[in-house]
Amino acid sequence: YINWLYFFHTWQMSGVYSEARSSLMEDAMKLLQESESRYKSHAIFCLYKAVSDGDDIIFEDRRIPFLRQQHRGSQSQPNICMSDFIKPAELGSEDYAGLFATTVDMGFVEDNSEDGYMGMLAQSLADRIAEATAELLHERVRKTHWGYAPNENLTPLELHRCAYQGIRPAVGYPSMPDLSINFIIN
């Protein structure tokens, strides 16, 4: 589930093969193999009844404000907001939305920070592992827990291209740029 393209992008090694890129991959694989039995990724998810109210989404007992897109695409298209994808409260019927959180054991980065390079390698791998954990969890939610795509059978490349039904927006990215949402969700 690891998207290696983004790993290399973090290291500004997108595109063509090079000795440095090959060496980085060897170091990453070695660190993963050495760490596999000592560290774990963790994930939690909740599926909630939800409705929208303006730019906010109300998850049962919690109101979360979302920002509308700040960059204007075209004059004919409105600036969208995450709340636009949830049924409005005034319709009188509920919709559903899920929240995910993923992380990697803190020791993974701390224990591998003996020098700058290893620390950066561990941090960039931890980011990719957390993202891969979210991808795996999202797949399980679609196929089993929520079950709206039980027969889905996507390749890793199709997963990375988001060829699945539904969306998996992430805090800090363009669809949800406000990092303070983390404190509300927590």
Per-region residue spans from a language model:
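Active-site loops and adjacent core secondary-structure elements that bind or stabilize anionic groups
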Residues: Y1-M120, S124, H145, L154
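Compositionally biased, low-complexity/repeat regions
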Residues: A43-F45, K49-G54, E135, E139-N186
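Carbohydrate-interacting regions of secretory-pathway proteins
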Residues: I129
